[in-house]
Every structure is written in structure tokens, then in C-alpha cells.
Amino acid sequence: MSEYLKALFELKELRQKFIFTLLMFVIYRLGSHIPIPGINPEALRDFLKAFEGSVFALYDIFSGGNLGRLTVFALGVMPYISASIMMQLLTVAIPSLQRLAKEEGDYGRYKINEYTKYLTLFVATVQSLGIAFWIRGQVSPKGIPVVENPGISFILITVLTLVAGTMFLVWIADRITEKGIGNGASLIIFAGIVANFPNAVIQFYEKVKTGDIGPLTLLLIIALIIAIIVGIVYVQEAERRIPIQYPGRQVGRQLYAGRKTYLPIKINPAGVIPIIFAQALLLIPSTLLNFVQNPFIKVIADMFQPGAIFYNFLYVTFIVFFTYFYTAVLINPVELAENLHKAGAFIPGVRPGQDTVKYLERIINRLIFFGALFLSVIALIPILISVWFNIPFYFGGTTALIVVGVALDTFRQIETYLIQKKYKSYVRR
């Protein structure tokens, strides 16, 4: 940590990246206080108290509290996350997109990114329409309308405002990725979660103060939070090292001995992405179903609330699926085996070619299984604890995993930058 702080002060380029990222965060937080035109803030606040502890509250966490205040950034970057999921699935399913992503290089990546933005626009429009039609007819418990003039003009302005806010956030995310430190979309979600920490701590303290959370439960929560953070750091940093052997070679009269190294594969290569993807998918039906005022639909909507058996089952299923899916996107055993063969390297005790592919597949599948199991436990246990002990849902494994995971990924990128900087200075000498 001290090395990173020292580098921020000493290296001008890294300092500029850090300042640029902070500036983007400031713009994001300023926009988080600009409400949608036509909303009565007090009536909205009273109305949304009924949704505390629901999936709506979880979405509000990911949006940095913007959804609960219905600001211009109410949708956050979740439409972009949802569009990215759809695009990756389409890339696997449609051969032309698959060729574009794998064979066209920078141009292919540019086009895939462009299609993702168009899809984001569509998803954001649908979600903003849903919010506009839902909120315009709502009233607070005191009978005060949430929307002062719920006409067609309110719907149009709300849709335009929310879509523009989401696309602006996507632009900010791209700028952070390009000119700042870390992954822009992940950092925006990270910033939103961290911004809500003070309110969550205050709410938690109030429950302790009033006796809603007893001493034993408090100790259990603290122990759980520490265990989750330690477990996340351990699994995110742990890796399986596959031994690699390079044969000896002769150059002229000089004989070079073979050397040994290793191929590092993360225990959880997918990181926090499966959790974010699973949440993004579950939030869509949960949000849409809550918009419909119908007794039968309400029963179905309750099945999609955190803590419900059906919700937990789908949550774990999506986490496992996206862990396998995203790891398959990141790590291709066939390509790894081909690259080893081209470099003249081999795995001791394993024949090159198909045997190497099968060996790598076996190891990767074991790692994926452990990673999926870990993510499921981290995501599910805090939800169950929050339901059993009536603890604020904010202190969940999902938020902890995202915060710790994004922080580790960002520090890793800084470390990579420092290594590249040292290597360049060494080459110049």
C-alpha cells in the first residue's frame, strides 16, 4: 500500500490518472444530487420506505442511492452491464459476431463495443419507461402524489433524462478506463456502494442502540464481515501454478540449459463479474414485476425478493453459470496449449497436443467449480443472515465482494503499470 501511495506522488503520469479518476467521481457524485423534473422529494422518500430490504433497495445500492432519490443517474450503469451480458451471449451464439470478436482485432473489439452501446440505449429506454409509468401513479402514505403533473410530458422528460444519464455514465466509465485507473464501469458501481457506507453505518448503529441487534448478533456480524473480507482477499489473490518446462537449446557453439517456470491460473479467474451479472439479470424481472399492481403478480414478485427460496436458487444458478461462462471467455485451454507448443514449452509428464488440452481443461474446471462455490457462499450466506436476524441488507457479501474485488483489481492494475514503468526505464539503459 505504501509503495502505491509513494508512486502516486512520485510518478507524474500515474498521479494524473489518479486525479482524472477522482475528477470523474466528483462529476458522478454531483449528478447524483440532480433529481428528475416533476418529482416531490418528500413524497418520494415516504413512499419508498415501504421498499426497504427489498430487491429495490439492492438496486439502489448499485446505483449509489440514485434510484431512491430518482436522480438523473437513477439507472446507474446497470443497463450497460445487462447489455454486456447479452452481447457476450450473442457473441458465443452467433458465428459472425464470434469471428468479429476473435479475428478482426482492434476493429472487431471496436464494433462489439459499438453494438453494446446500442443495446445499452435500448435497455435503458425500456427500464426508464417502466420507471416513468410506475412512479407517475404513486402516492405517499400521507396521500401526497409523488409526481406533481403525471402527464405524457413527464414520461417523455423522465425517459430522456434517465437514458441521457445512463449514457453519460457509460461515457464517464469509458474515460476512466482509457485515461484513469481501473475499469470504469466497476469503479462507478464501487463509488456508488462506498458513497452509501455512512448511511448504512448510521442505520446499523441505530439498530444496535435501540436493541434490535443484540450483543451476540453484533459479534456474529462483525465476525462474518471479517471472515468475508479475508476469504475474498485470499481467493481473489490465490492461484494454481502449473509447472512449465522449456527444453535446452543450442545457439552456435553455446548450449543453453532448459529452464522451468509456471503457468499461473487464478482460483477465481472471473472475479466479481458473475455476481454483478447475476444481480443485473435478477433485477430486471424483480423491478418489472413490482411495477404491476396485481395480487397474483405480487405473489410472483415476492418470489424474486432477496431471501426467498426461488430467488436464492436462481441467484446461485446464475452465479455458477456466469462463473463457467466468463472463465471460458477469459481462458481457452486450446489456445493455451497452442501457445505452449509454439513457444517450445511443455507440461512435465503430459504429452503436447490434445493431452495438454485435456489436462488444462481438467484443472480449469476444478478451479471454476471451487470459484463458483465460493462466490455462491459469499453471496448467499449474508442474505440468509440478514433475513434471520433482520440485519440491514446493505451488509451483504455481494457488496463486500464488489468493493474488495474492484479494489484488488485496481491495485493490480497500478502494480502492472509500475512494473511496465520499471521495465521501460531498464530497456532505455
Curated annotation (Swiss-Prot):
Main location group: membrane
Membrane topology designation: Multi-pass membrane protein
InterPro entries: SecY, SecY/SEC61-alpha, SecY_CS, SecY_dom_sf
Pfam families: SecY
Keyword Transmembrane helix recorded: yes
Membrane-spanning intervals of the chain: 14-40, 65-98, 112-132, 155-178, 182-200, 215-235, 268-286, 308-329, 361-385, 394-414
Subcellular location: Cell inner membrane
Stretches assigned to the Cytoplasmic side: 1-13, 99-111, 179-181, 236-267, 330-360, 415-429
Topological domain spans for side Periplasmic: 41-64, 133-154, 201-214, 287-307, 386-393
Gene Ontology biological process terms in this record: protein transport by the Sec complex; SRP-dependent cotranslational protein targeting to membrane, translocation
UniProt GO molecular function: protein transmembrane transporter activity; signal sequence binding
Record's keyword terms, sorted: Cell inner membrane, Cell membrane, Membrane, Protein transport, Translocation, Transmembrane, Transmembrane helix, Transport
GO cellular component, one term: cell envelope Sec protein transport complex
Intramembrane segments: 65-72, 73-77, 78-98
Subunit composition and interactions: Component of the Sec protein translocase complex. Heterotrimer consisting of SecY, SecE and SecG subunits. The heterotrimers can form oligomers, although 1 heterotrimer is thought to be able to translocate proteins. Interacts with the ribosome. Interacts with SecDF, and other proteins may be involved. Interacts with SecA.
PANTHER family listed in its UniProt record: SECY/SEC61-ALPHA FAMILY MEMBER
Function field: The central subunit of the protein translocation channel SecYEG. Consists of two halves formed by TMs 1-5 and 6-10. These two domains form a lateral gate at the front which open onto the bilayer between TMs 2 and 7, and are clamped together by SecE at the back. The channel is closed by both a pore ring composed of hydrophobic SecY resides and a short helix (helix 2A) on the extracellular side of the membrane which forms a plug. The plug probably moves laterally to allow the channel to open. The ring and the pore may move independently.
Similarity section: Belongs to the SecY/SEC61-alpha family.
Name this polypeptide is given: Protein translocase subunit SecY
Organism of derivation: Aquifex aeolicus (strain VF5)
